[in-house]
């Protein structure tokens, strides 16, 4: 039986006093890809921020257990060191910090956490060359400031490059398809698929079904008003694509 990577039970959370998550239940096992869909404002991105420990979001009930450990006891950087990775919908630009230095510092922080010797610049450059092929990135991007002047597709590929370097146990991709054309979407998706293995898990958050043509999920969940109200397979995403999110109003609000 596969190990449970993430177990969320009756999770409630708020931001600025407003309750956003209203009883989320979710279990993700090793080797699985899960997708969460839902209209804007349903709580999808809030869930990703709560899992990763964003300080603006307060857990008001329930629990998040990651590999047997209560996540509420960990600071955001501790969650990252424990193997949780978040690919942002809108990656930040950091002028003056080269992409290479950022990746090397992040990678060495993980090695230090694991009790391993840090890599010097030369050894790290050897390591990163093979990772660049995963997302088809030109090595010249390593010398540029982090995400500065990058196109939307380049920023998203850079997020997957970070994922390839850090080899997280749980990857959360928050609307990784946002703003991507078909070619960029294909490259990013191929990178995600390449990095999948029996020991890790991926949570894909998306608004549109088209991403799931490239990253094939094992389970699809639909969020509505802060809860997961439906779960299923690929057919559920196709049904949403055909009927639109308005059909959820009929399904969820229909009298019992």
UniProtKB/Swiss-Prot annotation:
Binding site for ATP: 38-45
Record key words, sorted: ATP-binding, Nucleotide-binding, Transport
Residues of the ABC transporter domain: 6-250
Record-level Gene Ontology MF annotations: ATP binding; ATP hydrolysis activity
CDD domains found in the cross-reference section: ABC_FeS_Assembly
Highest taxon in the source lineage: Bacteria
Gene3D superfamilies named among the record's database cross-references: P-loop containing nucleotide triphosphate hydrolases (3.40.50.300)
Family, as annotated: Belongs to the ABC transporter superfamily. Ycf16 family.
Protein name as catalogued: Probable ATP-dependent transporter slr0075
Species assigned in the record: Synechocystis sp. (strain ATCC 27184 / PCC 6803 / Kazusa)
Record lineage: Bacteria, Bacillati, Cyanobacteriota, Cyanophyceae, Synechococcales
